[in-house]
Amino acid sequence: MENLEQTCASLRAQIAATEAQLAGLKRDLEVAEQAAAEIKAQDVKSTGIREEGSEKKNPWPLLSEEYKRYGRQMIVPQLGLQGQLKLRSARVLIVGAGGLGCPAALYLAGAGVGTLGLVDGDTVEHSNLHRQVLHRSKNVGKFKVDSAIEYLRELNPHPTYVPYRAHLTPQEAPEIFKDYDIVLDCTDNPATRYLISDTAVLLGKPLVSASALRTEGQLIVLNNPPRPVGDKSGGPCYRCVFPKPPPATSVVSCADGGIIGPVVGTMGVLQAIEAIKVITSSPADETSASPPSLLIFSAYSTPPFRSIKIRSRRANCAVCSAEASVTVETLKTGSTDYVFFCGVAGPETLLRPEERITPLEFKKKHPGQVSHEQELGGSKEPTIIDVREQVQFDICSLDNSINIPISTILSSAASPTTSTPESLPSWLPHDIVSSSSTDPIYVVCRLGNDSQIAVRKMKELGLDQGGKRFICDIQGGLRAWREQIDPDWPEY
């Protein structure tokens, strides 16, 4: 019976997803038909057609409306009419319709690229809106590519917009990339970055890659000029610059590390600029191009920009060298495993079940403030240690909790040989380290990972007094607290 219910639920979910996709396609068709009608009407007006049989060919390469729309950039010497014509015939693929992809798509659509493809399987969330400038509040829950294209069509109906409502996979990447001239990597995870770079090299596509976190960003143009595999004169790929991926546990997302909107917006706009430069360049520009470099942006530094030269193609690169082991075939067959290559951090499970407690269990065990009578009766009052960084603790915190950031805890020296108050770190409050105190300690963080690390560290320091004192983490962190205890708890 349970299996049948799961099957029914799965089928309902598939039907709902299919209906949503169909509705999205219908909207795309309606907007496309409207845009086509507007362009046709403009074309009729600009060519002076009065009636059937009296057609007059437009003597100019652009429509009258296009001269007005793009005139301010066409009078720039680096672009000109020929540059605009190159833009109009260009096919640009943007992977990721988030903080980087939105401003990049916005300016490329505004510049008049001919075809703009958007790849993203995510839907719009409220937490996206402060930085992902193509999405609006009314589109929360909608596929990001649909939300973005809706905005872009209002900005400029001339380009052809192609949505890909799924995350990029190795099997599908070559088939998608082959239809485009240049690719923009606007994603935020290493596995996808390597996949995008590998596919771009194998299919001969220049790649503009960027990243942003907190107040900093990076930008690099890869595989430019795009030369065949084994040709040392080609631009380096992502593997040439970063042969080994960072440890999975060291990768910090915007959700964990934070991001200032204009920082990621700056990087996305820079991606659009680099894409326009590549599209409008000439063969002579390729021969005289500057060595590849990594542009680093730091919003709170002076000066905010600096550039680092990077090496050319590596002689032993797994993708672009003569010794390449990654091919289109290995992508399509799945034998190139990007998740295995980059590793997966996943949720931490460092503690035994008896060292963890759910928010609901904690609430049942400690329903409220311990009264004076209870204290006299020998009941132990819990100590809650919040190991989030102070900037997060200041946003919201549990009543009577103590803030000791995980960074402070991890900076402690090796475990002491004794657990006397004098041997314990100074960051621990005196009443906690007192040898007479056996009050239980509950450790909480945002998601339930750092709290486990902190519990293990505290026990290594001897704070549990050889097992006499109960120390555990609140499983799932403050996100679980919101789900189980307080639905009004701020979610950030």
Curated annotation (Swiss-Prot):
Residues engaged in binding ATP: 99, 120, 127-131, 144, 188-189
Keyword Metal-binding in record: yes
Leader peptide range in chain numbering: none
Gene Ontology BP term (one): invasive growth in response to glucose limitation
GO MF assignments: AMPylase activity; ATP binding; identical protein binding; metal ion binding; molybdopterin-synthase adenylyltransferase activity; molybdopterin-synthase sulfurtransferase activity; thiosulfate-cyanide sulfurtransferase activity; URM1 activating enzyme activity
SUPFAM superfamilies reported in the protein's UniProt record: Activating enzymes of the ubiquitin-like proteins
Binding-site list for Zn(2+): 237, 240, 317, 320
Cofactor(s) needed: Zn(2+)
Annotated keywords: ATP-binding, Cytoplasm, Metal-binding, Molybdenum cofactor biosynthesis, Multifunctional enzyme, Nucleotide-binding, Nucleotidyltransferase, Transferase, tRNA processing, Ubl conjugation pathway, Zinc
One GO cellular component term: cytosol
Primary location: cytoplasm
Transmembrane feature ranges: none
Disulfide bonds: none
Location of the protein in the cell: Cytoplasm, Cytosol
Database matches in SMART domains: RHOD
Similarity field: In the N-terminal section; belongs to the HesA/MoeB/ThiF family. UBA4 subfamily.
Protein name: Adenylyltransferase and sulfurtransferase uba4
Lineage: Eukaryota, Fungi, Dikarya, Ascomycota, Pezizomycotina
